[in-house]
């Protein structure tokens, strides 16, 4: 009986992990679409057309404490300085997907 439960648990674990990875990949795909449609005009390639020193590059995000999903999500929802707020224009899921995409791209060096 223990062996059957162990096998069942192992199969179930692989199933859950597989779907979690698919969902995460889909989030990055959506994040890229949201970023391209709403952010790329000012932030193409992780740059910043308005404030060139405030890029989305990994070292700059870290230096400005913007290297977490929560920090990026908050900034996108509420805006700051020249950056408009997108909280009323985009749903929370799209903003979080875009934040995940930004962090992923910053890790890859854009």
Curated annotation (Swiss-Prot):
Keyword Calcium applies: no
An example Gene Ontology CC term for this record: chloroplast thylakoid lumen
UniProt-annotated binding residues for heme c: 39, 42-43, 83
InterPro entries: Cyt_c-like_dom, Cyt_c-like_dom_sf, Cyt_C6, Cyt_C_IC
GO biological processes: photosynthesis
Post-translational modification: Binds 1 heme c group covalently per subunit.
Annotated compartments: Plastid, Chloroplast thylakoid lumen
Example GO molecular function: electron transfer activity
Main location: plastid
Gene3D superfamilies in the record: Cytochrome c-like domain (1.10.760.10)
Chloroplast keyword on record: yes
Cleaved signal peptide residues: 1-25
Entry superkingdom: Eukaryota
PANTHER family registered for this protein in UniProt: CYTOCHROME C6, CHLOROPLASTIC
Similarity comment: family membership: Belongs to the cytochrome c family. PetJ subfamily.
Job description of the protein: Functions as an electron carrier between membrane-bound cytochrome b6-f and photosystem I in oxygenic photosynthesis.
Protein name: Cytochrome c6
Organism: Pyropia yezoensis (Susabi-nori)
């Amino acid at each position: 009986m223990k062996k059957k439960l162990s096998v069942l648990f192992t199969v179930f674990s692989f199933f859950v992990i597989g779907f979690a990875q698919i969902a995460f990949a889909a989030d990055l795909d959506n994040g890229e679409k949201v970023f391209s449609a709403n952010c790329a005009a000012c932030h193409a390639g992780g740059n910043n057309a308005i404030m060139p020193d405030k890029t989305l590059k990994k070292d700059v995000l870290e230096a400005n404490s913007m290297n977490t999903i929560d920090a990026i999500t908050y900034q996108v929802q509420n805006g700051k300085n020249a950056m408009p707020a997108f909280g009323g224009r985009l749903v929370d899921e799209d903003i979080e997907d875009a934040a995940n995409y930004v962090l992923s791209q910053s890790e890859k060096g854009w």
